Amino acid sequence: MIPFGSKSCLAVAFALASCTLWAATREPPAQDKGPEAEPPKAEGHKFEPFKPEAVASNGSVTVGGHAISYQAIAGTLIVHPKGWDDVPRDPNEKPAPGAPEGGEPPNPTAEAAMFYVAYFKSGGGPRPLTFFYNGGPGSATLWLHMGAFGPRRIVTSTEAHTPAAPYALVNNASSLLDATDMVFIDAPGTGFSRIAGKDKEKAFFGVDPDAYAFAEFISEFLTKYGRWNSPKYLFGESYGTPRSAVVVNQLESDRSIDLNGVILLSQILSFDLSPDRPTGNPGVDLPYQTVLPTYAATAWYHHKLPAEHPNLETFLTEVEQFAMGDYARALAAGSDLSATDRNAIAAKLHDYTGLPVEYILKADLRIDGGEFRQNLQGDGNITTGRLDSRFSGPDLDPLSQRADYDPQSSALGSAYVSAFNEYARKELHYGEGKMFKPSIRTFRTWNFSHQLPGQGEGPLSPRQGTNVMPDLANAMKLNPNLKVQLNAGYFDLATPFYQGIYEMRHLPIPQSLQGNIEYRFYQSGHMVYAKESSLKQLHDNVADFIRRTSNTGG
């Protein structure tokens, strides 16, 4: 799940625990040997490197009326940041002629133990392999694991707060084990993953070091489990979608690993398009345009529109045309827009959002996500959901200009965290003595600067919004057979569905490669799978995508 910048994501996080293993030792006191005796020297703290783990178990899941036996492996693989070499440099080696003073830099000391749960179908021939991860940044992958495709699924309320424990774990009839073997990965420092060593946050908390760690993990996994010749897929949700764009490009460019497909759920590749506080970037009006269809879908769902629209998809097509037509021209005019045209656009925005014309004019025709969520049902002191705008909850502060929390995250978080802890410890037999961290506070310290493909070693200025569209485009050009599937919910105000369409239509790729991209939309939110009927549709679409692109004739 969890979207970048979500306060509610952090609300379900446990307090951070120490993730480094230290051993403090001292030599025993030296015997008094007279005047020549030297005082003992303290060795200080010594970092004990992580060791890989693997705990195997067996289970069965029924999908489509067929029982599938599987082996589950819960464990960790050890990854290192860029620049690390498995052959340590000899400190006594003299630098080569012309080398920098002091020779080559020493190996980075930071490392990560990345936690994963892998599911392998028992028996049968070669199988596709899909790597799953959520986003954040700073989120573990319990959301996709327990809510979408793992063999066990947590039961939650569809559009209301799930009652407190006990929670129900059931057979997941929408598990993707019928189409692919699966690997669910926790990002460094999240879930049961741990980081340690000097500058560990710098080594793993950023667009590029995070992607490098995932690419390293995937390479190690393919070796450990002998899966180099398997059809390979990435499945990322939310921040996991920009991660996928960078990872697929790194795998193909730096490691010569071609993938069969990339599956994106709730996509954001260009952060300049985020509907959260676009007022901080005046002159860039696209976020207001690409979020407008989601505002319309939300107002339609809550019956806030002045007119009836019996077919949601037909209505949204109309709104999309307005957003990229008359609305785009009005915003581009800026202060040159006439009063007559301004009033006409405000009236049309009222028709599509349900917000009062006076409010829209006061907002200069530009309404950001937090303000929309606070005001759509504000007359009843109700806050509208961010991750899933079908959800509602009482205002924390009825006088606030913007929404203070996300009712959907508050409604589901406890069920998911409790279910995964129960499942991991009792059924996967992993985690004794370890704290599970569903999310960690990395967003404000995350390094969003990014080195673009083909730009040498110079990183993108951190003052620019992160944009990884060139990475996905580069991967598609390097591997013209790479297929991409975009999945999105109509009621997602964190990563609006039309934003994903806009990004894909503007990838810098030849027109012929646009045919490698397919789109699937759902009457659901950011966590499409939180609605059981949408989960079934998502399963069917993804399974079909894998079967069509795996080159196995399945």
Locations of regions flagged by a protein language model:
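Glycine-rich nucleophile elbow surrounding the catalytic serine of serine-hydrolase chemistry
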Residues: 236-249
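Alpha/beta-hydrolase active-site loop
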Residues: 177-180, 187, 204-223
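N-terminal cap/lid subdomain of alpha/beta-hydrolase-fold enzymes
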Residues: 26-43, 84-203, 505
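Catalytic histidine-centered segment of alpha/beta-hydrolase-like enzymes
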Residues: 523-535
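Alpha/beta-hydrolase fold catalytic core
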Residues: 334-494
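A catalytic-pocket lid/entrance helix-loop region that shapes and gates access to the active site
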Residues: 151-155, 248, 252-353
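Alpha/beta-hydrolase fold nucleophile elbow
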Residues: 226-239
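Short alpha-helix in the alpha/beta-hydrolase fold that links the catalytic acid
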Residues: 482, 496-506
